[in-house]
Amino acid sequence: MPFEEAMKRLFMKKICMRCNARNPWRATKCRKCGYKGLRPKAKEPRG
């Protein structure tokens, strides 16, 4: 199902809580600043 693949591509990322860089899902530290505080990308809209 293409929709499922698109969701994985868009949301299977981690976001650095210091510099907001997008990182791979399996990352343990940020690729830009080296910070270890990563969160999964939000799947629900805010607001």
Curated annotation (Swiss-Prot):
<dbReference type="InterPro" id="IPR001975">
    <property type="entry name" value="Ribosomal_eL40_dom"/>
</dbReference>
<dbReference type="InterPro" id="IPR038587">
    <property type="entry name" value="Ribosomal_eL40_sf"/>
</dbReference>
<dbReference type="InterPro" id="IPR011332">
    <property type="entry name" value="Ribosomal_zn-bd"/>
</dbReference>
<keyword id="KW-0687">Ribonucleoprotein</keyword>
<dbReference type="GO" id="GO:0006412">
    <property type="term" value="P:translation"/>
</dbReference>
<dbReference type="GO" id="GO:1990904">
    <property type="term" value="C:ribonucleoprotein complex"/>
</dbReference>
<protein>
    <recommendedName>
        <fullName>Large ribosomal subunit protein eL40</fullName>
    </recommendedName>
</protein>
<dbReference type="Pfam" id="PF01020">
    <property type="entry name" value="Ribosomal_L40e"/>
</dbReference>
<comment type="similarity">
    <text>Belongs to the eukaryotic ribosomal protein eL40 family.</text>
</comment>
<dbReference type="GO" id="GO:0005840">
    <property type="term" value="C:ribosome"/>
</dbReference>
<dbReference type="GO" id="GO:0003735">
    <property type="term" value="F:structural constituent of ribosome"/>
</dbReference>
<keyword id="KW-0689">Ribosomal protein</keyword>
<dbReference type="InterPro" id="IPR023657">
    <property type="entry name" value="Ribosomal_eL40_arc"/>
</dbReference>
